[in-house]
UniProtKB/Swiss-Prot annotation:
Pathway: Cofactor biosynthesis; molybdopterin biosynthesis
Gene, per the UniProt record: moaC
Entry-linked Pfam families: MoaC
Record GO biological process: Mo-molybdopterin cofactor biosynthetic process
Keyword annotations of the record: Lyase, Molybdenum cofactor biosynthesis
Keyword Membrane appears in the UniProt entry: no
Family: Belongs to the MoaC family.
Record note on quaternary structure: Homohexamer; trimer of dimers.
KW Cell cycle (keyword) present: no
GO molecular function: cyclic pyranopterin monophosphate synthase activity
Protein name from the UniProt record: Cyclic pyranopterin monophosphate synthase
Length: 167
């Protein structure tokens, strides 16, 4: 089993030194869902929310979250993000919204945390904007789907796979 990289030999938390790693193109894709009452989803899709365009605001919040990941997660490196694509897809048949985020950079470390953070922030923004009408919403299945670049190369979650070991 691989060792945890954020601890030194004394067991103290530290930021991993990526200074000697080459800069490569890196990409990560994450997804997550927010389940809600059908009436809440209809309100969002109709654009009738008094706070404004829920999905548009959530998209911008998620992009901002990707850019601020190093400020939120203590041992993350600040990364020059080159692209964020955040798509919010209403799924009326399941009474939920899917968030899928792709983040890219050219750098010495990956953007998995940025993709996961962007996804969470977008979903949290939907919750915040709609909690007055539906406090029972549930953020679910936030996970990494794919990462490309770096020493570990390409990793992709197997279809239907809920959990994965490092490969």
């Amino acid at each position: 089993m691989p060792e945890l990289t954020h601890f030194n030999t004394a067991g103290d938390a530290h930021m991993v030194d990526v200074g000697g790693k080459p800069s490569t193109t890196r990409m990560a894709v994450a997804e997550g869902y927010i389940a809600m009452l059908p009436e809440t989803l209809r309100l969002i899709m109709a654009g009738g929310h008094e706070k404004g365009d829920v999905l548009g605001i959530a998209r911008i919040a998620g992009i901002m979250g990707a850019k601020r990941t190093a400020d939120l997660i203590p041992l993350c490196h600040p990364i020059p993000i080159t692209h964020v694509d955040l798509a919010l897809e209403p799924q009326p048949e399941a009474s939920r919204i899917r968030c899928r985020t792709t983040v890219q950079t050219v750098g010495q470390t990956g953007v998995e945390m940025e993709a996961l953070t962007a996804t969470q922030i977008a979903l949290l923004t939907i919750y915040d904007m709609c909690k007055a009408v539906d406090r029972g919403m549930s953020i679910e299945s936030v996970r990494l789907l794919e990462k490309i670049g770096g020493k570990s190369g390409h990793w992709q979650r197997a279809s239907g796979e809920a959990r994965s070991s490092t490969r």
